[in-house]
Amino acid sequence: MKAHVYVTLKQTVLDPQGQAIHGALRKMQYQGIEDVRQGKYFVIRLSDSLDAAAAKAEIERIANDVLTNPVIEEFTFRLEE
């Protein structure tokens, strides 16, 4: 089983890298781009012995304890068989 974990800054936190990318896209005349937020992406391979509920709990614990700074970041994830 794999977990795909996406970590982003909270909407209330300024994202200077996202703003820089947005500015570059505008200068390059890309159309229809309203906002850019940058983040991190992790793929975590889990033991096949974990059921879906245990895998979900483990990923939530890992994301909260290791992958994010909960003051400024949030995460989402999806599990893949």
Features from the language model and the residues they span:
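C-terminal structural segments of small proteins and small subunits
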Residues: 53-81
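Non-catalytic surface loops within mature trypsin-like serine protease
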Residues: 9-11, 48, 81
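Short, charge-patterned binding micro-sites
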Residues: 38-51
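Short glycine-/aliphatic-rich beta-strand segments at the starts of folded cytosolic domains
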Residues: 1-11, 40-43
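N-terminal glycine-rich anion-binding loops that anchor highly charged ligand groups
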Residues: 31-37
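Short, conserved charged micro-motifs
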Residues: 14-16, 50-57
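Short amphipathic alpha-helix segments
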Residues: 12-30
